[in-house]
């Protein structure tokens, strides 16, 4: 089995204007980095995100009707791109890891759309049911709305690039959305031949 190269492409990092991630003692590995937020809280700025409700259809299982997902848009002046951030299991847009990532991206010049999945507070009242690893019926409308935002957040006429970042289960949901069928993409208003991101 071959593993992907763990060293980031220096040209890509330069193009994005970011430095490579470096693990630091004592927070080696994903498990300890996750515990870091619990053991060593970070002093984050007051949340200034603009609330944005994104309409989603009823679940195909019939377990819950249509509703909306609450997200928060953080937008610096003249953003380089828009990054949609998904929380993990039991998380929300208010969790420290999501907020810390959003603040870091904003400081680097990226607009950030922090999403609360179906059943996650503070938008729990907007849509019944819960989220799962395979919830494209909820995620594809979010990506459609994000694409619209990419066109409205720029003054140059060319839409901003759209990126996604998912923490834990949020990463799995993001990958599943990228693997959606063309029929799912059409239903969400996305290009059936292209990737959602």
Name these PLM-found stretches.
Residues 145-197:
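Primarily recognizes the serine-hydrolase "nucleophile elbow" in alpha/beta-hydrolase
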Residues 99, 103, 140, 175-179:
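Short, hydrophobic alpha-helix immediately C-terminal to the catalytic nucleophile
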């Amino acid at each position: 089995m071959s593993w992907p190269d763990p060293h980031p492409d220096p040209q890509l990092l330069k193009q994005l204007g970011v430095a490579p991630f470096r693990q630091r003692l004592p927070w080696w590995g994903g498990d300890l980095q996750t515990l870091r937020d619990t053991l060593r809280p970070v002093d984050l700025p007051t949340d200034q995100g603009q609330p944005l409700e994104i309409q989603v259809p009823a679940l195909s299982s019939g377990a819950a009707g249509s509703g909306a997902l609450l997200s928060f848009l953080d937008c610096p002046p003249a953003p380089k791109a828009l990054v949609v951030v998904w929380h993990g299991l039991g998380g929300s847009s208010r969790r420290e890891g999501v907020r810390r990532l959003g603040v870091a991206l904003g400081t680097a010049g990226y607009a950030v759309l922090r999403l609360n999945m179906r059943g996650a507070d503070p938008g729990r009242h907007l849509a019944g049911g819960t989220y799962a690893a395979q919830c494209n019926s909820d995620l594809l409308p979010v990506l459609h709305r994000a694409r619209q935002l990419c066109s409205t957040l720029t003054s140059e006429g060319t839409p901003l690039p759209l990126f996604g970042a998912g923490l834990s289960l949020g990463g799995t949901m993001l990958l599943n959305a990228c693997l959606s069928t063309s029929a799912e993409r059409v239903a969400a208003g996305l290009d059936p031949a292209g990737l959602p991101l």
